[in-house]
Regions:
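Bacterial N-terminal signal peptides
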Residues: 8-18
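A short gly/proline-enriched turn/hairpin at secondary-structure junctions
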Residues: 54-67
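Surface-exposed, charged secondary-structure patches
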Residues: 76-119
Length: 152
């Protein structure tokens, strides 16, 4: 029992030390993590207007989508799904001059619907580009693809 307790204590101590050695998140990085959390919450609650408030009016992506196209995609997805659950994993946050940033993340998506199986599930990888305008982060462009596929 003493060996188990000592081993457990050592593991906990090493984890605490390792966390203490990592750099603290910068203010812009913390803001972007909070931005992602707000977006996930809005999507799970199917709050399209709240989500669109996070997208810049000048949004454009490599697929040729503009802001209105993204709103249409959200509208269709929200209408098709009865419930939505998202499991995000932020892989990387890059900050440029504290007014621009890039987030690379993987999101597991599951939803219940009225289809034959009654549910759908996918995993996507996203590369999001953001700008900070008037103290608010706004999505200006995005690339995405199913997990394992090329981002476009």
């Amino acid at each position: 029992m003493k060996v188990l307790t000592r081993t457990l204590f050592t593991v906990v101590l090493l984890v605490c030390v390792a966390q203490g050695c990592s750099e603290p998140a910068s203010a812009p990085e913390e803001e972007l993590r909070a931005w992602v959390a707000r977006g996930i919450d809005a999507a799970e609650n199917k709050e399209r207007r709240k989500l669109m408030g996070m997208v810049a009016t000048a949004y454009v992506d490599a697929r040729g989508n503009e802001r209105d196209d993204i709103e249409g995609l959200l509208r269709v997805y929200f209408l098709r799904q009865n419930n939505i659950t998202l499991l995000p994993k932020i892989e990387e946050i890059t900050i440029y001059d504290e007014t621009a940033g890039k987030i690379v993340m993987t999101v597991g998506m599951a939803g219940t619907n009225d289809g034959v199986l009654g549910f759908s599930a996918d995993a996507y990888r996203f590369a999001l580009e953001l700008e900070k305008d008037a103290n608010e982060w706004q999505l200006i462009s995005a690339r995405w693809g199913e997990l394992g596929d090329e981002l476009r």
